[in-house]
Amino acid sequence: MIILPAIDLKEGKCVRLYQGDFKASKVVAEDPIEVALKFKENGAEYIHIVDLDGALTGQIKNLSIISSIIKTINIPVELGGGIRNLNTIDMLIDAGIERVILGTAALNNRGLVKEAVKKYDRKIAIGVDAKNEKVAINGWLNVSSTNYIDFAKEMENIGVRNIIFTDISKDGTLKGPNLNQLKKLNESVSCNIIASGGIKDIEDLKVIKEMDIYGAIVGKAIYSGNIDLNEAIKIINKESSR
């Protein structure tokens, strides 16, 4: 299982949210490039970045910092937040983004998902962000009537291979992930599932790994010191090689 440390960007800084609430954002680092470098030094093989300003506005807002991170760390980066059309996807892939995450656009525009998957295949991931099992969009401000499992199945049928699942009520809480919803999703589709939201310690990571989940995104638990990234990667890799 791959561990993806998270960088959430707001106005050029690293922040953490609580249950997706933009008003409750807290700056955890002034220099995201420094954070990314530290993640790399601690053994990260992949970094998860969200442009929170982009998620709200529908346009990438932190591109210069994201580009600097890519050039500086030289390990794969996946990016979500504000990606709404194929031109933006083209631009991001050209800029060196390894995997582009579609959320709002995927729910509102199935045609875009089809086009993007046809052109970029595994480089496209879908963010399935759920609130009470319904898919939330537009920076998690609006909750649709679409069930998260139904949405994931539809994305799989289009050809999507990677799904990032977040239970919004758990995000930033350090109360543990929603294992029931995660299990249901993993049993319902054959896509690679990356778990996000609420992971609080190494035990959570071990449980997720035992569920045969492809990856786990860890944010607040690293910034708060609950998880030592280097130690977590070593432990999870050791368990993988048994």
Swiss-Prot record:
Keywords: Amino-acid biosynthesis, Cytoplasm, Histidine biosynthesis, Isomerase. It is found in: Cytoplasm. It catalyses: 1-(5-phospho-beta-D-ribosyl)-5-[(5-phospho-beta-D-ribosylamino)methylideneamino]imidazole-4-carboxamide = 5-[(5-phospho-1-deoxy-D-ribulos-1-ylimino)methylamino]-1-(5-phospho-beta-D-ribosyl)imidazole-4-carboxamide. GO terms for cellular component: cytoplasm. It is an enzyme of class 5 (isomerase). One of its GO terms (biological process) is L-tryptophan biosynthetic process. One of its GO terms (molecular function) is 1-(5-phosphoribosyl)-5-[(5-phosphoribosylamino)methylideneamino]imidazole-4-carboxamide isomerase activity. InterPro entries: Aldolase_TIM, His_biosynth, HisA_bact_arch, Isoase_HisA-like, Isoase_HisA-like_bact, RibuloseP-bd_barrel. Belongs to the HisA/HisF family. NCBIfam families: 1-(5-phosphoribosyl)-5-[(5-phosphoribosylamino)methylideneamino]imidazole-4-carboxamide isomerase. This is 1-(5-phosphoribosyl)-5-[(5-phosphoribosylamino)methylideneamino] imidazole-4-carboxamide isomerase. It comes from Clostridium botulinum (strain 657 / Type Ba4). The gene is hisA.
